[in-house]
């Protein structure tokens, strides 16, 4: 029975997702239905948490909008998530960046990860 479930879940996994980690700044384009038409809405922010559970994987993105912190959780393999674009890699030493919720201003900044060429 579980082999059938695994096979069905593997069919629905997205393969075109970029590699991203906590601390990275990403732009998530989400399909939003308004009335009878559908459009893409971009949500740009810092990834503060990732939950890897196969088809049930999720990640949380945090941004500051009009001086107010906004967090949004996305299902990684959801059909509502159109695309994920990594804008900037962040150098952090934690898997969950919940401490950013209490920080504001310069203390909430994340250093950029230096990559070898």
Swiss-Prot record:
Function: This protein is located at the 30S-50S ribosomal subunit interface and may play a role in the structure and function of the aminoacyl-tRNA binding site.
GO cellular component: cytosolic large ribosomal subunit
Name of the protein: Large ribosomal subunit protein bL19
GO BP: any one term: translation
HAMAP family assigned to the protein according to its UniProt record, in alphabetical order: Ribosomal_bL19
Family: Belongs to the bacterial ribosomal protein bL19 family.
Pfam families, A to Z: Ribosomal_L19
Top-level taxon in the UniProt lineage: Bacteria
UniProt keyword terms in alphabetical order: Ribonucleoprotein, Ribosomal protein
GO MF annotation: an example: structural constituent of ribosome
Gene: rplS
């Amino acid at each position: 029975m579980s082999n059938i479930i695994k096979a069905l879940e593997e069919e629905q996994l997205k393969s075109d997702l970029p590699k991203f980690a906590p601390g990275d700044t990403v732009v998530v384009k989400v399909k939003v239905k308004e009335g009878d038409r559908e459009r893409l809405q971009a949500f740009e922010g810092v990834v503060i948490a990732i939950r890897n559970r196969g088809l049930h994987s999720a990640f949380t993105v945090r941004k500051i909008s009009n001086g107010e912190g906004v967090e949004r959780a996305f299902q990684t393999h959801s059909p509502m998530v159109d695309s994920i674009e990594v804008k900037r890699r962040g150098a952090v030493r934690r898997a969950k960046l919940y401490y950013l919720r209490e920080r504001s201003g310069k203390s909430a900044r994340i250093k950029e990860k230096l990559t070898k060429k």
